């Protein structure tokens, strides 16, 4: 037990760690181009933040949070998602005092106690963006454009954008009445969870994954039929902007997202098999829910990195391989150790990926190891090489050897990389 990781977690190393790093680097590169600043918030927050922000009736709050009492009996929760913590930090640090909208991104661990499955873990890592301060649909379009670019660059080029509008608090109340009336006619055929949901928050029934419930909600009232004038105009402007930018989309009235803070626009990117790659939407009431003195519109999205990695593998998308070791510096004799490591340090300072021997192996064993780790070139340094100031650099693929002054090795490797 002590040598086994907890259920629903991963150890990151080797190729998986490298692929995860590529995804995170791409996220940071794109956010830099969009002038979105990185934010890091605590791994844990006061439980009430998620109860008020995410929503008391959500599965996340009711069933999936890792919550505990600290040594002073304060209720603390490991963050199940990134938005609530980012908005809390935005408010606490008075970021709203800055002129213009505030655009933040994070790459963070998140924790949910749910049944582990492919691409879904109890500890996962989330790339998310929060665009705070704009009520314009252009804010949604900016995030949708960023995600579209991200998915194309990472290799998931067939992802499709699905959008919906679930309205604001006012039109949602009218819709909930109509939905509840409809659901009551089919209550006997709903799953036990949805029978509870329909009383507390009927919109959650639309999100149910049980086949019987999915069949029932096919004919349920649609949120877009109950939008007030403002929400309707917002949704129409969003569609117009997407058309103008040639971003294809599909209106999917089954999207409501699983968190209570969403208003107006909700969206998901799905693959060809209909599995969600990432999702987000507008949450104009979340800031006010956390701090009643503030009322600031916002929009954001979250993307599970493990989920992206899972679909990259499933769809057989090849990512760039790890950079090869450019040079292995072999050591012949104890007297050459210091000088060899001096060369290694110089090469690394030039940005050349370099390895050497730390195990006092024979030269034959060192060359075998260099071949095993995929070194592109090797060089052996011993007393003769140091005395002459010359050494032979061997290309491991062709077997070709080139005699060089020691001080020219770095330039040679860089030129032939």
Swiss-Prot record:
InterPro entries: aa-tRNA-synth_II (IPR006195), aa-tRNA-synth_II/BPL/LPL (IPR045864), Anticodon-bd (IPR004154), Anticodon-bd_dom_sf (IPR036621), His-tRNA-ligase (IPR015807), HisRS-like_core (IPR041715), HisRS/HisZ (IPR004516), HisRS_anticodon (IPR033656). It is found in: Cytoplasm. GO terms for biological process: histidyl-tRNA aminoacylation. One of its GO terms (molecular function) is histidine-tRNA ligase activity. Its EC number is 6.1.1.21. Gene3D superfamilies: Anticodon-binding domain (3.40.50.800), Bira Bifunctional Protein, Domain 2 (3.30.930.10). Keywords: Aminoacyl-tRNA synthetase, ATP-binding, Cytoplasm, Ligase, Nucleotide-binding, Protein biosynthesis. The keyword 4Fe-4S does not apply. It holds the Pfam family HGTP_anticodon. GO terms for cellular component: cytoplasm. The keyword Aminoacyl-tRNA synthetase applies. It catalyses: tRNA(His) + L-histidine + ATP = L-histidyl-tRNA(His) + AMP + diphosphate + H(+). Belongs to the class-II aminoacyl-tRNA synthetase family. Homodimer. This is Histidine--tRNA ligase. It comes from Lachnoclostridium phytofermentans (strain ATCC 700394 / DSM 18823 / ISDg) (Clostridium phytofermentans). The lineage of its organism: Bacteria, Bacillati, Bacillota, Clostridia, Lachnospirales. The gene is hisS.
């Amino acid at each position: 037990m002590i040598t086994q990781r907890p259920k629903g977690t991963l150890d990151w190393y080797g190729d998986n760690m490298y692929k995860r790093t590529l995804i995170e680097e791409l996220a940071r590169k794109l956010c830099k181009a969009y002038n979105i600043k990185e934010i890091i918030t605590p791994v844990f927050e006061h439980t009430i933040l998620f109860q008020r922000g995410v929503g008391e009736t959500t599965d996340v709050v009711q069933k999936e949070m890792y919550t505990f009492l600290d040594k002073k009996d304060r209720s603390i929760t490991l963050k199940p998602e990134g938005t609530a913590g980012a908005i809390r930090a935005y408010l606490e640090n008075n970021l709203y005092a800055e002129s213009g909208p505030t655009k933040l991104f994070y790459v963070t661990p998140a924790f949910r106690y749910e049944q582990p499955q492919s691409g879904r873990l109890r500890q996962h890592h989330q790339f998310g963006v929060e665009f705070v301060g704009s009520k314009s649909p252009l804010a949604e379009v900016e995030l949708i454009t960023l995600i579209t670019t991200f998915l194309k660059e990472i290799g998931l080029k067939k992802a499709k954008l699905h959008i919906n509008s679930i309205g604001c608090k006012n039109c949602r109340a009218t819709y909930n009445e109509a939905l509840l009336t409809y659901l009551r006619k089919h209550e006997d055929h709903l799953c036990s969870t949805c029978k509870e949901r329909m009383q507390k928050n009927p919109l959650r029934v639309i999100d149910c994954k049980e086949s019987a419930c999915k069949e029932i909600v096919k004919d349920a009232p649609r949120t877009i039929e109950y939008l007030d004038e403002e929400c309707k105009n917002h949704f129409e402007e969003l569609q117009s902007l997407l058309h103008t930018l040639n971003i294809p989309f599909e209106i999917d009235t089954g999207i409501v997202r699983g968190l209570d803070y969403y208003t107006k626009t909700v969206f998901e990117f799905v693959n060809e098999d209909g599995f969600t790659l990432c999702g987000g939407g507008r949450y104009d009431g979340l800031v006010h829910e956390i701090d009643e003195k503030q009322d600031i519109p916002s929009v954001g999205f979250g993307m599970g990195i493990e989920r992206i990695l899972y679909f990259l593998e499933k769809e057989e998308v090849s990512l760039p391989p790890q950079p090869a070791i450019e040079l292995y510096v072999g050591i012949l004799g104890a007297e050459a150790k210091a000088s060899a490591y001096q060369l290694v340090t110089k090469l690394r300072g030039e940005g050349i990926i370099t390895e050497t021997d730390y195990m006092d192996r024979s030269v034959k064993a060192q060359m075998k190891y260099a071949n095993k780790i995929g070194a592109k070139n090797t060089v052996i340094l011993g007393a003769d090489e140091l005395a002459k100031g010359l050494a032979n650099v061997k290309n491991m693929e062709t077997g070709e050897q080139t005699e060089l002054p020691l001080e020219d090795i770095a330039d040679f490797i860089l030129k032939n990389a």
